Amino acid sequence: MNINSTLIGQAIAFAIFVMFCMKFVWPPLIGAINDRQRKIAEGLNAAEKAKADLATAERDVQQELDLAKTKAAALIEQANKSANQLVEDAKSQAQVEGERIRQQAQAAIDQEINQARESLRAQVAELAVLGAEKILQDKVDVQKHASMLDQLAAKL
């Protein structure tokens, strides 16, 4: 192969083209490549950070759920205790009220029995006086009569 001026001209043109590319074309391409690498690295870092944040958030959510379940169980237990206490209080109040009503009824019965006894005593005394009057055919003195009735009533 012969070296002639065309080959030298082409070599010079190629060298100028390479220098032009190194000076004006290559730096923007390298800058774009570096920017793209940086953006990809930032995206990967952001994805890793988001993944870590997601894991932390899931752990926090699980802890909150566990805490909420514990609180709910405690509230349910407290409500059950309160309900049981209300039932027990109602039972005891009902027993006290029943006892009070029974005592009142017993007192009323006792009072009616006493009234009936007094009424019977008065009737018996009156009948005794009437019987004695008829037997004696004489009226008895009122004060004597009252004292006799009192003595008779006390014996009955």
Swiss-Prot record:
Topology in membrane: Single-pass membrane protein
Gene Ontology molecular function: proton-transporting ATP synthase activity, rotational mechanism; proton-transporting ATPase activity, rotational mechanism
Membrane-spanning intervals of the chain: 11-31
GO cellular component: plasma membrane; proton-transporting ATP synthase complex
Iron found in the keyword field: no
Major localisation: membrane
Xref: Pfam families: ATP-synt_B
Keywords: ATP synthesis, Cell inner membrane, Cell membrane, CF(0), Hydrogen ion transport, Ion transport, Membrane, Transmembrane, Transmembrane helix, Transport
Cell location: Cell inner membrane
Protein function: F(1)F(0) ATP synthase produces ATP from ADP in the presence of a proton or sodium gradient. F-type ATPases consist of two structural domains, F(1) containing the extramembraneous catalytic core and F(0) containing the membrane proton channel, linked together by a central stalk and a peripheral stalk. During catalysis, ATP synthesis in the catalytic domain of F(1) is coupled via a rotary mechanism of the central stalk subunits to proton translocation. Component of the F(0) channel, it forms part of the peripheral stalk, linking F(1) to F(0).
Alphabetical list of HAMAP family matching this protein: ATP_synth_b_bprime
Subunit structure, interactors included: F-type ATPases have 2 components, F(1) - the catalytic core - and F(0) - the membrane proton channel. F(1) has five subunits: alpha(3), beta(3), gamma(1), delta(1), epsilon(1). F(0) has three main subunits: a(1), b(2) and c(10-14). The alpha and beta chains form an alternating ring which encloses part of the gamma chain. F(1) is attached to F(0) by a central stalk formed by the gamma and epsilon chains, while a peripheral stalk is formed by the delta and b chains.
UniProt similarity note: Belongs to the ATPase B chain family.
Protein name as catalogued: ATP synthase subunit b
